[in-house]
Design a protein with these regions (language model features):
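Pro/Thr/Ser/Gly-rich low-complexity, intrinsically disordered linker/stalk tracts
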Residues: 23-62, 119-123
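Low-complexity, Pro/Ser/Thr- and charge-rich linker/hinge segments at domain boundaries
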Residues: 26-31, 121-149, 652
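Surface-exposed, short loops/turns at beta-strand junctions within beta-sandwich domains
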Residues: 91-98
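Extracellular fibronectin type III
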Residues: 108-124
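Aromatic-lined, polymer-binding surfaces characteristic
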Residues: 156, 172-176, 191, 206-414
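Carbohydrate-active enzyme catalytic cores, enriched for enzymes
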Residues: 310, 336, 374-539, 589-593, ...
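CBM-like, beta-strand-rich accessory domains located in the C-terminal region of large
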Residues: 546, 550-746
Length: 746
């Protein structure tokens, strides 16, 4: 049976008749015109929220303003709060129903700026997530004896038990590494400073080498600290002390400084804070003082970049580096509150904001617009913060509905058997072991049946990784929910997944993106683009390679529209990069057992170069995909349909063949005026640190200049036509002949 999401209702999750009555035009006011990037407005207008009470966010109008947030129920009951922050979390659940909310910004001169009213619906049965008062959380953290970041009492006993039972193979591997490391000395402090390099490429090489060294050393030191904390052995303890004090001796103004290599400085702050906490009772008073002093030096500039006087993360939450910094400040504050004089203030600033934002790259539906590669690194950076908050304060972010739905998102966009991510920087990297590691680490911390199902079928992870070994001891069921469909659209981020069969490893999967977040941060100029997988093999994929952020290859090709399965014109011109306003949106979606389709509008992404950029993808299950494009421009253009593959595309007599190993597709690319075809291997990045060889870039270009394009691309995974696919226009739509089969498109 076909199921349809009526986008006029802008339903992010469960359908709601109340939400369908909402006028969906985005209100035009100071909250919608504050400039980009900004803190996204939540709850979105006409949204059906998935958390009670919902998180409230809005853009800062101007630093120094005071805000009055007002929420009115459908029966006229109002509640309000005055705040200098542009976000708020209520301290009790909301009753199911429809609500209207607005914000009044009061500037220092006494002028008031009222926003338009926005509406949201809270369906019956919405999960409750109430955050205790910050003062209460801080008091609990301060009262908690060290080690706060590790479980205590019966929870600690249970952790020790599983390390000797079901997690014993991984624990044994970690112990073996630490045993082999006992006679190694401390790593030498780096002496080469990126700031002293005159060429950008040389600077990047030093930055990357410093991070590679620190990544290894961070793991080494934390493993030693964990073994020393859980095993009563003098040799382990002396080894952990030696490593931690060795890192503490590094010059915080040298090559490892925040100004020189912020990732290294951040990792040092984390290692020192965890080492201080986990081994607290084994440090002398002088050693504790020295460690706290060094933690303060390391964390100081991180605090300034996240929650300092300029309140950067409130102004621009869509800052990948700043978001990680915010989590680090929150985690370090939890571990050092009451010990480090400034830690209480950091706690009060960072913990509630981190709880509210978490990962602000999507809405309640669990979307993550910054790409799946960076979604995994969010988990890598956050697991110890989640553990520290839960163990020290009782605040369990694993019960936050967004994280539950984030788990559902992973199940649909990196389903079992996937080797690569989707969309954005690093999506092409083949690292199933990394995905398995962090999917399982998250599944042990987040109550999500979709995530549990995905974790049970993910394999190849390093079972000795700390994110897995110290995870909460929970029972994880590996059963896909009976209500699970084969298709999913996440409207908040403009992503859609359509599968022939979600549970099957040999599934055919069509992934589509047309994102309201545009091409900001690690996202690419790929609105209305798609990726096609056959089982684990990407048949039609995005192009380019991620060498380093902001590289010539990244800016000149990798992030560009022409490096994706999308439409360009006049020699590869396309959408704007590094621009949140260069956005798209899903305007139609329908899932089903035999047919699914998704429709996107990417007109804004081209920043005025086109008048219309429309694409609809039909998936005739299990193995036929058709992509319809409509483009228009005031200026005549040569339009280009770009396709990317691992092997050369074959185009003869207007018939297409594409393959990747055993995966194969046949079809055609059609326009009424005909197309010229050319292809070449893609440009490679200068950096040798990027991935494997180049992909093939096929360009189907209109033969003349025209103001409009109407095109249809057919990809048949069964190759049923024995080499012949015929497209004919009908009174309305198309008739497509594929061998003996006929398909009609509306």
């Amino acid at each position: 049976m076909l199921r349809r999401i009526l986008l006029a209702c802008y339903l992010l999750l469960a359908p709601s008749l109340a939400a369908c009555a909402c006028e969906t035009a985005t209100p035009v006011d100071w909250m919608s015109s504050s400039g980009l990037p900004v803190l996204p407005v939540r709850p979105a207008h006409c949204a059906a929220v998935s958390q009670s009470p919902p998180d409230f966010n809005w853009p800062h109008r101007r630093l120094g303003d005071r805000y009055q947030l007002v929420v009115r129920s459908v029966v006229g009951v109002e509640q309000s709060v005055s705040t200098t922050s542009n976000w708020h979390m209520w301290d009790k659940p909301f009753a199911p129903g429809t609500y209207t909310w607005w914000v009044v910004a009061n500037d220092p001169a006494g002028k008031a700026w009222r926003s338009a009213s926005r509406e949201f619906t809270l369906p019956p049965g919405t999960p409750v997530f109430v955050v205790p008062a910050t003062a209460s959380l801080l008091a609990q953290a301060r009262a908690r004896p060290h080690p706060r970041g590790l479980p205590q009492g019966t929870a600690r006993a249970e952790l020790v038990r599983v390390l000797a039972a079901e997690r014993e193979p991984g624990w044994r591997q970690l112990l073996a590494r630490v045993d082999a490391d006992l006679k190694r000395g401390t790593v030498a402090e780096p002496t080469v400073d990126p700031r002293n390099q005159t060429e950008r490429a040389d600077q990047v090489k030093v930055i990357q080498s410093l991070w590679a060294m620190m990544n290894v050393e961070q793991t080494r030191v934390l493993e030693a600290a964990l073994v020393a904390a859980l095993t009563p052995n003098a040799d382990y303890l002396a080894h952990a002390h030696r490593l931690i004090l060795g890192l503490a001796a590094w010059n915080p103004d040298g090559p490892s400084s925040h100004a020189s290599q912020f990732q290294v400085n951040r990792a040092l702050a984390v290692v020192l804070a965890i080492g201080f906490d986990w081994l607290y009772d084994t440090w002398s008073a002088d050693e504790r003082t020295a460690l706290l002093r060094r933690i303060g030096r390391r964390i100081g500039p991180i605090v300034s970049s996240a929650v300092g006087p300029t309140r950067d993360m409130e102004h621009n939450a869509l800052n990948s580096v700043g978001l990680t910094n915010l989590g680090v400040v929150a985690g370090v504050a939890v571990l050092t509150a009451g010990d480090l004089p400034s830690a209480d203030e950091w706690f009060e600033q960072a913990v509630p904001l981190y709880t509210n934002l978490l990962w602000p790259w999507g809405g309640d539906d669990g979307g993550y617009a910054n790409g799946l590669n960076y979604a995994m690194w969010e988990v890598a950076d956050a697991w110890w913060v989640l553990d520290s908050l839960r163990n020290a304060t009782g605040l369990d972010l694993g019960t936050k509905p967004y994280l539950r739905n984030f788990g559902r998102m992973l199940a649909y966009f990196v389903p079992p058997g996937s080797r690569q991510g989707l969309f954005g920087d690093g999506a092409e990297q083949d690292m199933p072991h990394v995905y398995a590691r962090y999917i399982k680490a998250l599944a042990l911390r987040v109550d999500s049946p979709y995530l549990a199902w995905l974790a049970a079928q993910s394999h190849g992870e390093d079972i000795s990784n700390m994110a897995l070994l110290v995870a909460p001891v929970t029972l994880v069921s590996g059963t896909l929910p009976p209500s699970a469909q084969n298709d999913l659209a996440l409207l908040s981020v403009g992503w859609a997944a359509m599968h022939s069969s979600l549970p099957a490893h040999d599934r055919v999967s069509v992934y589509f993106k047309s994102s309201p977040y545009g091409s900001i941060s690690h996202s690419h100029a790929e609105q209305n683009s798609f990726v096609l997988h056959v089982g684990a093999e990407p048949l039609l994929m995005a192009g380019g390679q991620y060498d380093w952020y902001g590289s010539p290859h990244g800016l000149g090709y990798y992030k560009q529209t022409r490096a994706h399965n999308a439409v360009t014109f006049d020699g590869g011109k396309g959408q704007a990069i590094l621009d949140q306003g260069a956005s798209g949106r899903i305007i139609g979606f329908q899932g089903g057992e035999s047919l699914a389709w998704v429709e996107g509008d990417a007109t804004l992404a081209y920043r005025g170069s086109v008048n219309r950029a429309w694409r609809r993808i039909y998936f005739f299950k299990p193995d036929l995909v058709m992509i319809e494009d409509k483009m228009s421009s005031s200026v005549p253009r040569r339009w280009e349909i770009n396709l990317h593959a691992a092997e050369p595309l074959r185009w003869r007599d207007e018939q297409l063949e594409v393959s990747n190993g055993k995966a194969k597709g046949c079809g055609t690319v059609w326009t009424e005026s005909g197309l010229d075809f050319e292809q070449a291997t893609e440009p490679l990045p200068l950096s040798s640190s990027a991935g494997a060889g180049a992909r093939w870039h096929g360009i189907f270009r209109t033969r003349g200049l025209m103001t409009e394009l109407h095109a249809l691309t057919v990809v048949d995974l069964a190759c049923r036509a024995s080499g012949r696919y015929i497209v004919k226009t009908a009174a309305q739509g198309f008739n497509v002949t594929a061998g003996a089969a006929n398909f009609r498109l509306p």
